């Protein structure tokens, strides 16, 4: 009898112990293998009917949440209380072979009710437009993202990210695990239908968060086999972060998943959590089995679902077209008329590595320009207009309208654009050699431009201006021609860029006078006096540009000797003495004398005070190609519009002026000799 009683007691103890392993819970730690009796609060699509925690199913645009019912207490006076450790096994089954739904996340939240906070699709059922990126949200999540989207800016559709109060991850990486034998990370498809282990460990004292992944052995072992045996030594993500600034005193832990137009079944097969220490290792042999793959539906049900879907899409299309027509004027009409490719913000964010400073190519009056690389490998330059730029939108519209359809080998091509939440971004061809200004005036280049390279650049810019003035369907006035706006490609060909001040108009229509904009030294007399902008004002600026390239000097240089401060005036004085070539850049030892004289005289012709006496861009190109001889100005007189700039203006010049603090003097120059 005693033996029987002892046996009963023994098996009773074992039963209690096993029950504890299957469903062990206290306020600060618990382990679940079968979720049917787990102390969880479920909403949305989430259910535990078959043992595993089933977060999402084959429902479109839905969410599923599951939170441990007992709150976790985090005490501000004890940093160790913020330490926690959790591990869980998940499996995601896509309903279509190549599409994977939107993913899931482990969440620590001040509330168990995320139904009003979290939207579906790319927000993973956690965030929405109202609470995204708000410090008052107090949400921490580790996301397992299985679908590339334009909201979260993470990796490319199979990544793990750390989210703090926003769907935009503070750190993310392609899903993978460290293989010690191979000494490298091995890619790990998240939506493969296979079981995957995740460890999330946070040290509240050191303030370090580690996220580690590993595949689970299949089929399950018959005897106990613990997760600690397969945990990689190197975490996938490791980040210093102070969660005491994020967590409130009471938080809930759980999971969130979502679907959009793409559906998937998401399961949690086992879960262990502990506050203030290491979570109990999961026994792989005790994990819940994921259900079999979804069954094929009878033809009748398939047809019914298809008809319903078509009806829904048709109705949605009608509503979309109705709203599109109703709000057409709100959608910016110019965007339809001038429509280069539109990029998602996520793609540009990835391409520029989050607009990091080490990707910065330069900054101007309206914004910063960053280098980027698209997924295709194409290098781009992304101009991001400042939020507080008063003319930001106006400049953006001008560049889109002007550049979107312009095509010329000597123009920097606008590849596309992006508008998101007030952000203005323009995407251009990347010019690996930077601006011409860098080569002419900065010593950080490996070598100077040769004479033939400079001549080729001048001809290229002239060809681009001829296209803008005469060959495109409208007249395009660039209004800011200068060396810093000429970019150089890999072969050092010059390309005209930065259309931020550009204006375009139909042929035969004269533009009204406008506010004076441009750069000192490049602005024609009639522009500064009356605000008149024509192709002749572009020609005047091109003349200043020619002299700038040939002489290696800026049109106005406050650091030059007094007689050389105004470049066109100095060239004129040298012309009087039959010494034009004395003005050629001293770094050029291989220049061709006659070619240099032609360019200098052409620059002077473009600088005449009377716009009617300046040549057109077509004539200029004919002079440059040698098809027509330059007028014999060396034997006549030329009235030049030379800036009469005060010393104060010279020393306080700005790159782009809204007003011109100088006048022009009519100087008659007599050229003699060669």
UniProtKB/Swiss-Prot annotation:
Glycans are attached at residues 57, 117, 133, 185, 210, 242. The chain crosses the membrane at residues 302-322. It is a single-pass type I membrane protein. GO terms for molecular function: ATP binding; carbohydrate binding; protein serine kinase activity; protein serine/threonine kinase activity. Residues 28-274 are annotated as: Legume-lectin like. In the C-terminal section; belongs to the protein kinase superfamily. Ser/Thr protein kinase family. GO terms for cellular component: plasma membrane. This is Probable L-type lectin-domain containing receptor kinase II.1. The gene is LECRK21.
């Amino acid at each position: 009898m005693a033996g029987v009683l002892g046996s009963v007691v023994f098996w009773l103890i074992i039963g209690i112990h096993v029950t504890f392993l299957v469903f062990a819970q206290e306020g600060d730690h618990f382990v679940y293998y079968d979720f049917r009796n787990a102390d969880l609060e479920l909403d949305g699509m989430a259910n535990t009917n078959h043992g595993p925690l089933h977060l999402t199913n084959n429902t479109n645009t839905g969410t599923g949440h599951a939170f441990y019912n007992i709150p976790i207490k985090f005490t501000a006076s004890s940093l160790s209380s913020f330490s926690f450790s959790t591990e869980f096994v998940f499996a995601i089954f896509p309903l279509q072979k190549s599409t994977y739904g939107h993913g899931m996340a482990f969440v620590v939240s001040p509330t168990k009710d995320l139904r009003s906070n979290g939207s579906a699709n790319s927000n993973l059922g956690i965030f929405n437009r109202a609470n995204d990126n708000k410090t008052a949200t107090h949400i921490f999540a580790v996301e397992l993202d299985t679908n590339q989207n334009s909201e979260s800016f993470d990796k490319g559709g199979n990544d793990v990210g750390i989210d703090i109060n926003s769907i935009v991850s503070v750190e993310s990486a392609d899903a993978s695990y460290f293989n010690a034998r191979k000494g490298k990370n091995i890619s790990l498809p998240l939506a493969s239908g296979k079981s995957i282990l995740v460890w999330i460990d946070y040290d509240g004292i050191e303030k370090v968060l580690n996220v580690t992944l590993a595949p689970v052995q299949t089929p399950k072992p018959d005897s106990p086999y613990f997760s600690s045996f397969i945990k990689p030594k190197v975490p996938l993500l490791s980040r210093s972060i102070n969660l005491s600034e994020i967590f409130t005193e009471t938080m809930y832990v759980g999971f969130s998943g979502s679907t959009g137009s793409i559906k998937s079944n998401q399961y949690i097969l086992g879960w262990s959590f502990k506050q203030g220490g290491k979570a109990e290792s999961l026994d792989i042999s005790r994990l819940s089995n994921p259900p079999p793959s979804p069954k094929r539906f009878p033809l009748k049900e398939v047809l019914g679902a298809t008809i319903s879907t078509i009806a829904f899409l048709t109705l949605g299309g009608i509503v979309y077209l109705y709203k599109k027509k109703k709000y057409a004027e709100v959608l910016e009409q110019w965007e339809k008329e001038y429509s280069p490719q539109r990029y998602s913000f996520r793609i540009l964010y990835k391409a520029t590595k989050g607009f990091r400073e080490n990707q910065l190519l330069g900054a101007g009056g309206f914004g910063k320009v960053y280098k980027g690389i698209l997924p295709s490998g194409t290098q781009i330059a992304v101009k991001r207009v400042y939020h507080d730029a008063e003319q930001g939108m106006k400049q953006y519209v001008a560049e889109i309208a002007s550049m979107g359809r312009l095509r010329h080998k000597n123009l920097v091509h606008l590849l596309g654009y992006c508008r998101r939440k007030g952000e203005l971004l323009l995407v251009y061809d990347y010019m690996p050699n930077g601006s011409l200004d860098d080569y002419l005036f900065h010593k950080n280049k490996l070598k100077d431009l040769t004479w033939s390279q400079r001549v080729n650049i001048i001809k290229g810019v002239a060809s681009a201006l001829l296209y803008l003035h005469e060959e495109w369907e409208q007249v395009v006035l660039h209004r800011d021609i200068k060396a810093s706006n000429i970019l150089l490609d890999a072969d050092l060909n010059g390309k005209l860029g930065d259309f931020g001040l550009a204006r375009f108009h139909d042929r035969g229509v004269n533009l009204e006078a406008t506010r004076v904009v441009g750069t000192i030294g490049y602005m024609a007399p009639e522009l500064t006096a009356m605000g008149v902008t024509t192709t002749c004002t572009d020609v005047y600026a091109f003349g200043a540009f020619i002299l700038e390239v040939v002489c290696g000097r800026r049109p106005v240089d406050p650091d030059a000797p007094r007689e050389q401060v105004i470049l066109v005036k100095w060239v004129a004085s040298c012309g009087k003495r039959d010494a034009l070539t004395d003005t050629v850049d001293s770094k050029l030892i291989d220049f061709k004398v006659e070619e240099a004289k032609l360019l200098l005289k052409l620059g002077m012709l473009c600088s005449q005070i009377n716009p009617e006496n300046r040549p057109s861009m077509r004539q200029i190109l004919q002079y440059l190609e040698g098809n027509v001889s330059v007028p014999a100005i060396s034997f006549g007189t030329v009235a030049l519009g030379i800036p009469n700039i005060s010393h104060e203006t010279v020393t306080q010049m700005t790159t782009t002026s809204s007003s011109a603090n100088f006048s022009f003097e009519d100087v008659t120059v007599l050229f003699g000799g060669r």
